[in-house]
A protein has these predicted regions:
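Nucleotide-activated donor-binding/catalytic signature segment of Leloir-type glycosyltransferases, i.e.
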Residues: 224-247, 255
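Conserved acidic donor-binding segment of nucleotide-sugar-dependent glycosyltransferases
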Residues: 299-311, 319-325
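Conserved donor-binding/catalytic core segment of Leloir-type glycosyltransferases
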Residues: 6, 174-191, 197-201, 213
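Acidic donor-binding loop of glycosyltransferase active sites
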Residues: 251-269, 284
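Donor nucleotide-sugar binding/catalytic pocket of nucleotide-sugar-dependent glycosyltransferases
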Residues: 108, 133-169
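A short, well-ordered alpha-helix in the C-terminal region of glycosyltransferases
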Residues: 319, 326-341, 347, 353, ...
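Short hydrophobic beta-strand element within catalytic cores of glycosyltransferases
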Residues: 276, 280-281, 285-288, 298
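Short His-centered aromatic/hydrophobic patch
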Residues: 77-83, 110
Length: 359
């Protein structure tokens, strides 16, 4: 099957959606053509000439040519924004060489806040709904996102979840003192990394052995570094450069925590949180935020905890400081949970069966 993936999230861009789509392409045994903004990279990439959003007519002409030149069977939209703008126009395209002028099927993967924010903009809401209604099927990464979308569109919505590449790594759980807490994240306010610094500071002031490692970059980087500079706890900042850097990071920590919080009264939320699953795949206990689909990435009390505020975050970290043997128990439970419910093999089977059944 020849699949045209239209996306605003592709290498060299980083982030959860970009990581998800690259892994999807690597694991799906079909030919992919990638169409996106002028800066996308790759052997099968077709960068637009700076017209991806500002010139929809040129976008349509580009896609029409790609579809015909590459005998595209289906169009897969990598996310809802800005792709919802193209759906209705692309519904005029036929499957190449189709004797019956069959319309080319369109599918979309929706993640979380990228569609929910649009739904709260009055001018955009109706346009979003009308375009989503013209898709064959919408796939979501979490049950939370599926339920949110069901209020926006009548199109069939299927939660396919996420997939994680399980690392070839066995955690020996031998060095849990000091407790090294890690977070992999964009450094933005919604991730509440400042909470981690504040709580770690308080625990260090109480004489407990604790350190904090932060991997990522973003708007709050300078603010968080200033906060760390007056903290009692040792905070290390790392910028992710390669997959090996991320791999080494997960191997160097004992506990993963990212207490994300929804913003604007729930308009912007965590669609799922791939980093929670990545951390669990390394055999780490995980503390998630009470935001969107994040709570679907753990089994509370068995693989991690949900921290909706700083007090609960502190209690959750204290649990592992006071019960170090639970680090291994929770970590092993978490790795088993990810292997059972978040393998790429299961996701691909689910995705392909639903695409094939509709074609």
């Amino acid at each position: 099957m020849n699949i045209l993936l239209i996306t605003n999230d592709w290498k060299p861009k980083t982030g959860g959606i970009s990581t998800y789509l690259r892994s999807l392409v690597n694991n799906l045994d079909h030919k992919f053509i990638i169409y996106g903004p002028s800066w996308i990279e790759g052997d099968d990439a077709y960068p637009a000439e700076d017209t991806f959003i500002i010139n929809p007519r040129k976008v349509f002409e580009d896609i029409q040519k790609i579809v015909n030149d590459n005998l595209i069977d289906i169009i897969l939209h990598g996310s809802s924004n800005p792709n919802f703008l193209f759906v209705n126009k692309l519904n005029t395209l036929n499957v190449p060489n189709s004797p019956k002028n069959v319309k080319i099927p369109q599918y979309m993967i929706c993640h979380g806040a990228e569609f929910n924010v649009l739904n709260y903009i009055p001018v955009v809401r109706n346009l979003l709904s009308r375009n989503l209604d013209n898709l064959n099927t919408i796939f979501t990464v979490s049950e939370f996102s599926r339920k949110k979308l069901s209020d926006i569109t009548d199109t069939e919505i299927i939660n396919i979840g996420a997939g994680i590449e399980i690392p070839n790594y066995e955690n020996n759980y031998e060095n849990n003192v000091p407790l090294i807490i890690g977070v992999v994240s964009r450094l933005v306010s919604r991730k509440k990394i400042s909470w981690l610094i504040d709580v770690a500071h308080d625990l260090k002031e109480e004489g407990l052995p604790i350190e904090l490692k932060i991997l990522g970059f973003g708007k709050q980087e300078n603010y968080l570094k200033k906060l760390s500079s007056v903290s009692a706890v040792n905070v290390t900042f790392i910028k992710d450069e390669t997959e090996k850097d991320v791999d080494d990071f997960y191997r160097s920590i004992n506990l993963f925590a990212m207490p994300s919080k929804s913003k604007y009264f729930g308009v912007e939320f965590e669609g799922l949180g791939l980093v929670y699953l990545e951390a669990a795949s390394y055999g780490l206990p995980v503390i998630v935020g009470a935001s969107g689909g994040a709570i679907e990435t753990i089994i509370p009390g068995k693989t991690g905890f949900v921290a909706g505020d700083k007090n609960i975050l502190k209690e959750s970290i204290l649990y592992f400081l006071n019960n170090p043997e639970k680090i291994q128990e929770f970590g092993l439970n978490g790795k088993k949970f990810v292997e059972e419910f978040y393998s790429w093999e299961k996701l691909i089977i689910n995705l392909e069966s639903n695409i094939e059944s509709i074609k």
